A protein has these predicted regions:
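Bilobed "Venus flytrap"/periplasmic-binding protein-like clamshell domains
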Residues: 34, 44-54, 116-151, 165, ...
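Extracytoplasmic small-molecule ligand-binding "clamshell" domains
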Residues: 24-97, 135, 156, 243
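Short helices/loops that flank or line small-molecule/ion binding pockets
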Residues: 71-83, 100, 127, 148, ...
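Ligand-binding clefts/hinges and TM-proximal coupling segments of bilobed small-molecule sensing domains
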Residues: 62, 139-154, 191-193, 228-256
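Acidic, polar ligand-binding/catalytic clefts
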Residues: 53, 66-128, 140-141, 199-202
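Short beta-strand-to-loop elements that line the ligand-binding cleft
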Residues: 62-69, 152-166, 197-199
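Extended ligand-binding regions for polar small-molecule ligands
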Residues: 50-58, 117, 139, 210-244
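Periplasmic-binding protein-like
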Residues: 30-32, 107-111, 187-225, 247-254
Length: 256
């Protein structure tokens, strides 16, 4: 092969490597939200964490994970202190500053949790009239009728744990949370027997990995999405989903 052709091939290879090579690890921030991502005995765990970690491992990308309260996650990203946010909702207002990986990590279902000692059935929005509903700061609820309704009052709590604690102490009437996340947290806190939820959802959404809008990360977003789609076709992905399907199957099961 002529020298010139060898030089062209070498240059192309170097460019390809530069796409994913980084001088430092990819910095990803997230808020603990079991079973999707959380810390257990000092180790990062969770369905979406394991999915993302496996995909990034296959792509040869080293990652530095950091847990922060959700509003601080958004601030760290805005100030350039993070390269990505794990498990974020994709909304139009974020598109300008965030590059969303096209393939979603998980689909979620927001429901209203209640105390078994004081149930509030929910079928329609008017059922919530004059109630106080616990919400999470910085979270987006994509059902506009629920989000904008003035039929009920909202009260933010500093954490998901605090929200459920307020619910069992009757400081709020209902708490909105993802169905699976709420069940996992209730089991973890030993509140599973005291809480239940209305099966009618107040909305559904998807969780994504969002990256900074820089040249190198744009290519990474495309490769991550393609590799995630491949992973979803494998038996390992099916086993992972089954392991986190119910609170008792995952590492964050109720404490003794």
């Amino acid at each position: 092969m002529p020298l010139f052709q060898r030089q062209i091939i070498a240059a192309l290879c170097l460019c390809s490597l530069a796409i994913t090579a980084r001088a430092e690890p990819l910095r990803i921030v997230t808020e603990a939200w079991a079973p999707y991502v959380y810390e257990e005995n000092g180790q990062t765990a969770g369905l979406d964490y394991e999915i993302s970690a496996e995909v990034l491992r296959r792509l040869g990308v080293e990652v530095e994970w950091q847990f922060l309260p959700w509003k601080r996650c958004l601030l760290a990203f805005e100030q350039g202190q993070a390269d990505g946010i794990l498990d974020i909702f994709r909304i139009p207002e974020r598109e300008a500053n965030m590059l969303f990986v096209e393939e979603p990590l998980s689909e979620i279902e927001f429901v209203l949790f209640y105390s078994r000692s004081r149930p509030y059935p929910y079928r329609k929005l008017d059922d919530l009239r004059d109630l106080l509903i616990g919400t999470s700061p910085g979270y987006w609820y994509n059902d506009q009728a629920f989000r904008d309704s003035r039929l009920f009052s909202r009260e933010e709590a500093p954490s998901h744990e605090a929200n459920l604690g307020k619910l069992v102490r009757q400081r709020v009437d209902l708490v909105v949370n993802d169905r699976r996340a709420g069940l996992f947290l209730a089991a973890h806190l030993g509140l599973g027997a005291q809480l239940d939820y209305n099966t009618k959802a107040v909305g559904t959404d998807r969780l994504y990995l969002a990256l900074r809008r820089t040249n190198g990360l744009a290519t990474l977003a495309e490769r991550f999405s393609a590799e995630l789609r491949r992973f979803k076709q494998e038996a390992a992905y099916t086993r992972l989903q089954a392991r986190y399907a119910e609170p008792g199957n995952a590492p964050i099961a109720a404490k003794d």
